[in-house]
Curated annotation (Swiss-Prot):
ATPase subunit of a proteasome-like degradation complex; this subunit has chaperone activity. The binding of ATP and its subsequent hydrolysis by HslU are essential for unfolding of protein substrates subsequently hydrolyzed by HslV. HslU recognizes the N-terminal part of its protein substrates and unfolds these before they are guided to HslV for hydrolysis. Transmembrane segments: none annotated. GO terms for cellular component: HslUV protease complex. A double ring-shaped homohexamer of HslV is capped on each side by a ring-shaped HslU homohexamer. The assembly of the HslU/HslV complex is dependent on binding of ATP. Keywords: ATP-binding, Chaperone, Cytoplasm, Nucleotide-binding. ATP binds at residues 24, 66-71, 282, 347, 419. GO terms for molecular function: ATP binding; ATP hydrolysis activity; peptidase activity; proteasome-activating activity. It is found in: Cytoplasm. Pfam families: AAA (PF00004), AAA_2 (PF07724), ClpB_D2-small (PF10431). The gene is hslU. Belongs to the ClpX chaperone family. HslU subfamily. HAMAP family: HslU. This is ATP-dependent protease ATPase subunit HslU.
């Protein structure tokens, strides 16, 4: 099912309901993002003459850390399978300085988009690819003894690992004994009897980790150079010993890739990134210019001016082709404790017409976060201890006390929102998680007294609270 079909089936109200399964409160932010998403679907249904005139209304989320800014954007992208990329504004530097190039956010989005399209296309060819992979695996487990000796055609091929890729003869003479052996292996393979056997397969060599390190350090241009060079020479392969279970996955991916048209994949990936892509720019308040900032202010303003043309709409070169950013939805977010949205340069402010202020979390919100969402923290810890055969039970009073402590600590020290619950629950269940394998009990009940016993001593000492909770 394509993301356009998913968007067709989901109204803004239904999108908000789905977000409610994971995120507590922040109804205003959920509504704005749901409407922005639905407008993208509406735009796809319009005549071409008017469609190009309608651009997404970018969103600026304002609120403290841990209230759900990133999670809203990430969840909504998952719901409709839209390409989504999260970047931090502080990682970028002005053109000419060491740091990440602002255009890398678009390249990251296209990578995500192409991967999504590839996953969908792999599902379409799954049956044929699995059949081809199984045939190759059977031949690896029962190879023919009548192979022709392959020779290297020229020194250039030897240099770049260009040996003959085929491991079989052009016309393999398979005798009856080999046929019977392969037939038995096929039956055992399909029944999972050989999953733990070891087999040797050829796999593509992984990219040099040094290139990834340089890219992370801001040398994004190295990525383009590497892609250009990789296209000139065939990919080097090496032999690896893996289990049959793992070999199935490796060979399936290889066979599926052969059945997918690379040019079509790139074109569709770019189109989806352009029309459905979402880029979340976090910590945008950290690059807001403040009065009397000196050189730092100039640098921050430079990053804003570099981001501006991408948000306005420009052509960005990627290894898959040129991407037009005009119709990508940008969601920026920041706490704005030390600055205001008006501290951003006017041109950038104008590109984020929808402003949403997210609410601070209340004690009641903390209680709901612990219990209501599908991925609620308490449910996660219950599942963790269930693997040890222990049924973990929290009383209502215990959960209320945990919520109260989280709210109180946020009030007394730095407000880190819902992330405070992770710290408190880890401290609360620390001993239990450590001793769980040796505990011979089917169930353990966490009561209000237990919470007080574990956390009260820390709560009484302000210094300890700041360092531990």
């Amino acid at each position: 099912m394509t993301n356009l079909t998913l968007m067709n089936q989901l109204t803004p109200k239904q999108i908000v309901e789905k977000l409610d399964q994971y995120i507590i409160g922040q109804t205003g932010a959920k509504k704005s993002v749901a409407v922005a998403l639905r407008n993208r679907y509406r735009r796809q249904l319009m005549d071409e003459s008017i469609r190009d005139e309608i651009i997404p209304k970018n969103i600026l989320m304002i609120g403290p850390t841990g209230v759900g800014k990133t999670e809203i954007a990430r969840r909504i992208a998952k719901i409709v399978r839209a390409p989504f990329s999260k970047v931090e504004a502080t990682k970028f530097t002005e053109v000419g300085y060491v740091g990440r190039d602002v255009e890398s956010m678009v390249r990251d989005l296209v990578e995500v988009s192409v991967r999504l399209v590839k996953e969908e296309k792999m599902q379409l060819v799954r049956v044929k690819a699995e059949k081809n992979a199984e045939k190759r695996l059977i031949k690896l487990l029962a190879p023919s003894q009548k192979k022709k000796q392959t020779t290297t055609q020229n020194p250039i091929e030897a240099l770049f690992g260009g040996m003959n890729q085929s491991e079989e003869t052009t016309e393999e003479e398979v005798d009856q004994e080999l046929k019977n052996k392969r037939s038995q292996i096929e039956w055992r393979l399909q029944n999972g009897e050989l999953d733990d056997e070891i087999v040797t397969v050829e796999v593509k060599e992984q990219q040099n980790p040094m290139l990834d390190m340089m890219r992370g350090a801001g040398m994004d241009q190295m990525n383009g150079m590497q892609d250009a060079l990789s296209g000139m020479f065939p990919a080097k392969k090496k032999k690896r010993k893996v289990t049959v279970r793992e070999a199935k996955k490796i060979l399936f991916e290889d066979e599926a890739s052969k059945l997918i048209d690379a040019d079509e994949l790139a074109a569709e990936g770019i189109h989806r990134a352009e029309q459905m892509g979402m880029i979340f720019i976090d910590e945008i308040d950290k690059i807001a210019s403040k009065e009397g900032g000196g050189n730092a202010q100039v640098s921050r303003e430079g990053v804003q001016r570099d981001i501006l043309p991408i948000v306005e709409g420009s052509q960005i070169s990627t290894k898959y082709g040129t991407v037009n950013t005009e119709y990508i939805l940008f969601i920026a977010a920041g706490a704005f404790h030390m600055s205001k949205p008006s501290d951003l340069i006017p041109e950038l402010q104008g590109r984020f017409p929808i402003r949403i202020e997210l609410d601070k979390l209340t004690q009641e919100d903390f209680y709901k976060i612990l219990t209501e969402p599908d991925n609620a923290l308490i449910k996660q810890y219950k599942a963790l201890l269930k693997t040890e055969g222990i049924d973990l039970i929290f009383t209502k009073e215990a959960v209320e006390r945990i919520a109260e402590i989280a709210f109180q600590v946020n009030q007394d020290s730095d407000n880190i929102g819902a992330r405070r619950l992770h710290t408190i629950l880890e401290k609360l269940l620390e001993d239990l998680l450590f001793e769980a394998p040796e505990i011979n009990m089917e169930s353990i009940k966490v009561t209000e007294n237990y919470v007080n016993e574990k956390l009260a001593p820390i709560m009484k000492n302000k210094d300890l609270t700041q360092f531990i909770l």
